[in-house]
Amino acid sequence: MPTSSSPAVASLGDGPQGDAKHVLAALREQTRDEHQAIEQTLGLMSETLTLQAYRRTLERFHGFWQPVEARLQQRVELREIGIDPVERAKAPLLARDLRVLDVGNPAVLPLCREVPLVASTAAALGCMYVLEGASLGGQIISRHLGARLGITRESGGLFFHGYGERTGEMWRAFGAAVSSFAVTTEARDEMVQAAIGTFRLLRRWCERDEPLSTA
């Protein structure tokens, strides 16, 4: 999310649009530090991960994904470049996982108030890079949850199961949309700033200490 204090970042490239792999690889490289920071905060791949810690992560994710996805769904122009935020919504999956894990009514859990503004198409795509990346990486996390906690798609792992067998297809479609829009340096750099901002806001929300539920 661009702000006056946002760090300078290298451009995703000059000249005409690159292919999807190039644009996504550049996004990944320029958000590497923020990505690693949130992974460290969550500890989902830890060999000492507990069910309580996993449930808390789902609560935090629900509180972030729901308001962010609501904003993304207002960017109607995303559908013109092949992205349907409603089809890609994950908040309903998080709500289902929480109910399965006996958290209670997810609708009463607090929502994050400091979320990305997504005030432009480029900012929306940068934000979605973080959310869609969670679905892509969720395939690895899903296997770890099964091995460590016995969590399956049906028993509280639907969010990280994500698109399942369609994960690769959905990621490629997202990459194609990003590439088709990233035709100027300004658009590409705005995507990077939005992705960095989204990672940071998510980490800040997940680092809060107060309990979200009594489960």
Predicted regions located by residue number:
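Metal- and O2-centered redox machinery and metal/ROS homeostasis
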Residues: 1-215
